[in-house]
From Swiss-Prot:
Belongs to the FTR family. It is found in: Cytoplasm. Its EC number is 2.3.1.101. Involved in the transformation of 5-formyl tetrahydromethanopterin (5-formyl-H(4)MPT) to methanofuran (MFR) and formate via the intermediate formylmethanofuran (formyl-MFR). Catalyzes the transfer of a formyl group from 5-formyl-H(4)MPT to MFR to produce tetrahydromethanopterin (H(4)MPT) and formyl-MFR, which is then hydrolyzed to formate and MFR. This is Formyltransferase/hydrolase complex subunit D. It comes from Methylorubrum extorquens (strain ATCC 14718 / DSM 1338 / JCM 2805 / NCIMB 9133 / AM1). It comes from the Bacteria. Transmembrane segments: none annotated. Homotetramer. Octaheteromer. Part of the formyltransferase/hydrolase complex fhc; composed of FhcA, FhcB, FhcC and FhcD. It is an enzyme of class 2 (transferase). Its main location: cytoplasm. GO terms for molecular function: formylmethanofuran-tetrahydromethanopterin N-formyltransferase activity.
Amino acid sequence: MSDFTLNGIKVEDTFAEAFDVAGTAIIVTNDTPKWAMIAATVMTGFATSVIGCGAEAGIDAELSPDETPDGRPGVRILLFGFEPNGLKDQLLKRVGQCILTCPGTACFAGVEGPTKIKLGGAIRYFGDGFAVAKRLPDHEGKMRRYWRIPVMDGEFLCEDSVRAVDGAVGGGNLLFLGRKHADTLIVAEIAVEAAKAIPGAILPFPGGIVRSGSKVGGRTKGMMASTNDAYCPTLKGRAGSALPPECGVVLEIVIDALTSAAVAESMRAALHAATEIGAQHGLVAVTAGNYGGNLGRHHYHLRDLLEKPAA
């Protein structure tokens, strides 16, 4: 393998290794975009990594009233877990504690898929026997079941069940090697904006960016993951460092999506956006994280992402 350049920036001839995950989507609506976003922001908090948070979540899109089941402003949220049962547990907890509790919200299924997850059908028990089931047609005329749960500002309307998809992928990634922190952060921010514009893809870390990239295991017994020392600039003098002398900071983006194709397109968009402005911000190189191809079956080779994203 030989490295190559894109927009004058070195790109390592490597691949990002990603994993099969369970994924779902919900639509949260409210009377105003502000309150729909408040609910979505709270629900997707503490959801950067499945390992430490139980789920990975993010906001996929803001929706106009024409795009939602009840004709109000909305937000589409994506949620990912290791497997369907863990995903169900996180979905119920987060909707119950963050969407049910928020003034004015309603909650609907946001994606079709083969696996059913009871949502309103489980949360209805909060209604203490006063919740009422109702069937209403969707935009295609298909009857769907909802629960009207009495709450102090009226009622919480929640779809009886949502769906989990087959083919969701977690862990697409890019690493940006830069000279200075402020400049590299700008590059990563531009990459995030491009990546999250792809429908069905989210970047779950703070602002879409992670500084604490990890490797599997560690020196301490029982650690599932520890700092990726090969990419820590303060350890450049040690054997095993993967960083060139001029690199002073590394920032990573991680992408989860409902399909493998969405991960690839999100990575492509991020790679091109970052390298287009990289030279003026001291970007040294772009690479990706993998485990030698031994853990995840999805391999996204950076060489395959050279073609520009569709306009």
